[in-house]
Amino acid sequence: MKILKTILLTVFTLCITTACHHDVNEEEKTLAKRTVLIYMCAENNLDQYSFFEDNYRDMITGAQYLSDDQNLIIFADRMSKEEKPYIAKCDKNGIKKVKVYSEDFYCTDKEKMKEVMQWVAKNYPAESYALSLWGH
């Protein structure tokens, strides 16, 4: 009988202390109005002519007009084998890498494209999305 009381008291204590725990579920996350993904396949010989840097400058200039509830996300795969593909966020403060892949891959591979898009949707949820595919 004493063991049963101890078990019941333990279960009761666990229920009371964990019942008030509040997990934030997916619906409670603040949604942006819009998330735009610029998918840049720039792994080509035009990288040497500073097109990439020009594109970056243009995006930074345009980001000055974004509101706080809009996301401009960039996936970039460049010619350099030293610089792995990455995802960056562009806003009024500039461009900041938020994910760098550990290895190079073909950015046109449909499974990799799907992986990138799913990562962006999960990390930058929004009411609506846009995708812009860039290549030279």
Where in the sequence are the language-model features?
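Sec-dependent signal peptide recognition
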Residues: 2-10
